[in-house]
């Protein structure tokens, strides 16, 4: 076990694409932790999708041995955290497991919204922060301006910021020295009862669930019985080890160290991020603060395009859920789309990642229904119901009021696009809370309904700002608003997959747009089809799809007009009967296009 004074635990904080994973690669390479022949780009990002999108989804860790210029041998534990807002809780737990952070800022881009969000989490966790200006090899690099911006926007001293090019390896040695000199050593007592924080967990088909832990007090030994404090379950520890990035087994972990344990645990659901692990006898009484189970925020239906693939989809979803405790699912059926699942996600990126993995790793074509958020429906009898699916909305006459989730959105944008961004937020029922400037960029803070953001807000924001805006949000709570369920009826039959919750003031415009879109997408039938948008029993928009018509009077030339009349009346009666019993086939493309519709 290593002496506490010679351990440094740190994480790297950065916006997407500012070079966090590349810097981690260089630190590993410089210290010889991995042989050059085993080295590859984004070494810590194991999933294909992490590599391809250049994002980090799971918190990864590596133990680095480093001999400093003062001749002392140090153990550096790096936790590579996700940078995206959907995984903010994983970030906050990883932050609590370490004592310092490297703040990486791209010297060509400057401070971005997610840099801010994660830096504030590091400051909340009382971290010592070392600023690093990356990409100094690029001609567009402006180190002095960006250092000034770090001081203005974040308020930490950046005069001694380390200038690095993670690509070419410049400044890597200085970074390692700064970690040893400026970051504090961990605290902890060897003789106290075991207290360890669960930082992350994932499923391995050979070892069962692998649990990443940071030891706060006490010692974790092989063969111990440990207790998970959130659910009281007991487990027998059969392996302990560290990552260099490959697994290396050891016998024990002491205070301040970060490693992993396996204990024949079957499901990731039993190991919750942020939980406290202790001895089963004479364990600690007080759990580590800040634990909360992950709550899904965005819900949507996933249906296979080919209904014969339903069982394959069930297997695939169960396998993904093994590895992702924040992903929830339950079966649902839809008259239009058949059997599928109602799934809960942490946010839109999480939804996209899961959907991509299902399509890519399990080769299943999917239809995704419109994403919706969790509403609180207060009934007149005082009961509060959580509404995950608009199709389950109770009868309006029994509803007292509905509350929707609100978010605090922080948007950083060059000032020439500010007007467009303000208009976009206003259109989405936003309330402006703050507007400040850092150099030539504006920072806007808005209170927005999450319902307006999950649909396509991010895409619209990127398009009105030519891709220059960066955006970050956090949930702030629930607030009452005038919300209604809008149903779409095709040939007087409600189509459950197209029902959505909308604000009363915007229902008519949204309903009209939806009806027009469906009119273009549904093929014509032998009878006319009304397409309607309705709130309760009141129709607020309607389009009529005209019938295909056969010319029944073609065989009559000349002769009596009553003969033609008789044939036309007979056709009319047939069409009326057909409309009564005829079934309208809505093609899959119509669903997909209607759901992708610009809100």
Curated annotation (Swiss-Prot):
HAMAP family: LepA. PANTHER family: TRANSLATION FACTOR GUF1 HOMOLOG, CHLOROPLASTIC (PTHR43512:SF4), TRANSLATION FACTOR GUF1-RELATED (PTHR43512). It is an enzyme of class 3 (hydrolase). This is Elongation factor 4. Gene3D superfamilies: 3.30.70.240, Elongation factor 4, C-terminal domain (3.30.70.2570), Elongation Factor G (Translational Gtpase), domain 3 (3.30.70.870), P-loop containing nucleotide triphosphate hydrolases (3.40.50.300), Translation factors (2.40.30.10). The keyword Cell inner membrane applies. It catalyses: GTP + H2O = GDP + phosphate + H(+). One of its GO terms (cellular component) is plasma membrane. GO terms for molecular function: GTP binding; GTPase activity; guanosine tetraphosphate binding; ribosome binding; translation elongation factor activity. GTP binds at residues 17-22, 134-137. Its main location: membrane. Its EC number is 3.6.5.n1.
């Amino acid at each position: 076990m290593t002496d506490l004074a010679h351990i440094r635990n740190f994480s790297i904080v950065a916006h997407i694409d500012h070079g966090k994973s590349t810097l981690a690669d260089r630190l590993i390479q410089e210290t010889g932790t991995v042989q050059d022949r085993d080295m590859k780009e984004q070494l810590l990002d194991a999933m294909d999708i992490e590599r391809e999108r250049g994002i980090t989804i799971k918190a990864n860790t590596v133990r680095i041995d480093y001999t400093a210029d003062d001749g002392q041998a140090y153990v550096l534990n790096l936790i590579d955290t996700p940078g995206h807002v959907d995984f903010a809780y994983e970030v906050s737990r990883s932050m609590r497991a370490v004592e310092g952070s490297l703040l990486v800022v791209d010297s060509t881009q400057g401070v971005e919204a997610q840099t801010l969000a994660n830096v504030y989490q590091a400051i909340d966790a009382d971290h010592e922060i070392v600023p690093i200006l990356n990409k100094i090899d690029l001609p567009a690099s402006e180190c002095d301006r960006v250092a000034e911006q770090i001081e203005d926007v974040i308020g930490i001293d950046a005069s001694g910021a380390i200038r690095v090019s993670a690509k070419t390896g410049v400044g890597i040695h200085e970074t390692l020295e700064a970690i040893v000199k400026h970051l504090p050593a961990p605290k902890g007592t060897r003789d106290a009862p075991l207290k360890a924080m669960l930082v992350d967990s994932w499923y391995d088909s050979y070892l069962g669930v692998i649990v990443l832990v940071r030891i706060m007090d006490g010692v974790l030994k092989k063969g111990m019985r440990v207790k998970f404090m959130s659910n009281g379950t007991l487990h027998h520890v059969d392996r302990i080890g560290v990552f260099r990035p490959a697994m290396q087994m050891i016998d024990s972990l002491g205070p301040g160290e970060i490693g992993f344990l396996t204990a024949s645990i079957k499901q990731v659901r039993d190991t919750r991020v942020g939980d406290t692990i202790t001895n089963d006898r004479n364990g600690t009484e007080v759990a580590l603060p800040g634990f909360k189970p992950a709550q899904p925020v965005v819900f949507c239906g996933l249906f296979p395009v080919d209904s014969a693939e339903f069982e394959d989809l069930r297997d695939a979803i169960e396998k993904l859920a093994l590895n992702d405790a924040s992903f929830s699912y339950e079966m649902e059926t839809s008259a239009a789309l058949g059997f599928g699942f109602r799934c809960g996600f942490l946010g839109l990126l999480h939804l996209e990642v899961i959907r991509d993995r299902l399509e890519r790793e399990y080769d299943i074509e999917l239809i995704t229904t419109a994403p919706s958020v969790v509403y609180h429906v207060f009934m007149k009898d005082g009961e509060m119901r959580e509404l995950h699916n608009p199709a389950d909305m109770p009868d309006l006459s029994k509803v007292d009021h509905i509350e929707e989730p609100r978010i605090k959105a922080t948007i950083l944008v060059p000032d020439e696009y500010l007007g467009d961004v303000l208009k976009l937020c206003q259109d989405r029922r936003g309330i402006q809370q703050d507007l400040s400037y850092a150099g030539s960029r504006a920072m806007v803070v808005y209170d927005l309904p999450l319902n307006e953001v999950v649909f396509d807000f991010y895409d619209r924001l990127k398009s009105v700002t030519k891709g220059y805006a960066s955006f970050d949000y956090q949930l702030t709570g629930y607030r009452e608003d005038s919300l209604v369920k809008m149903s779409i009826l095709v040939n007087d039959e409600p189509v459950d997959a197209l029902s959505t919750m909308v604000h009363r003031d915007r229902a008519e415009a949204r309903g009209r747009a939806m009806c027009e879109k469906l009119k273009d997408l549904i093929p014509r039938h032998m009878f006319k089809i009304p397409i309607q948008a309705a709130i309760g029993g009141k129709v607020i928009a309607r389009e009529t799809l005209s019938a295909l018509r056969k010319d029944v009077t073609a065989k009559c030339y000349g002769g009596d007009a009553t003969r033609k009349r008789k044939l036309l009346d007979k056709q009319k009666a047939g069409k009326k009967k057909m409309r009564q019993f005829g079934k309208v086939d809505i093609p899959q493309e119509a669903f997909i296009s209607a759901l992708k519709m610009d809100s």
